[in-house]
Amino acid sequence: MYVCLCNGISDKKIRQAVRQFSPHSFQQLKKFIPVGNQCGKCVRAAREVMEDELMQLPEFKESA
């Protein structure tokens, strides 16, 4: 599913970036992929996908 239509970023692309870079904030994620830097309508959905994927990572599961 496309999350950011302006830049053609899908939830899959966000999840891949989270697994690869383990960003600790949405601002960090934006350094790796161009999400939320145009109209901003995707920010909430992109953040939710990022947080969901972070919770799946082993290092975050242990600290939760």
Curated annotation (Swiss-Prot):
Its cofactor is [2Fe-2S] cluster. It holds the Pfam family Fer2_BFD. It comes from the Bacteria. One of its GO terms (molecular function) is 2 iron, 2 sulfur cluster binding. [2Fe-2S] cluster binds at C4, C6, C39, C42. Binds 1 [2Fe-2S] cluster. The keyword Transferase does not apply. Keywords: 2Fe-2S, Electron transport, Iron, Iron-sulfur, Metal-binding, Transport. Changing V43I: In strain: ECOR 30. The keyword Repeat does not apply. Required for mobilization of iron from the bacterioferritin (BFR) complex. Monomer. Interacts with bacterioferritin (BFR). Up to 12 Bfd proteins can bind to the BFR. NCBIfam families: PRK10509.1 (NF007803). Belongs to the Bfd family. This is Bacterioferritin-associated ferredoxin. It comes from Escherichia coli (strain K12). The gene is bfd.
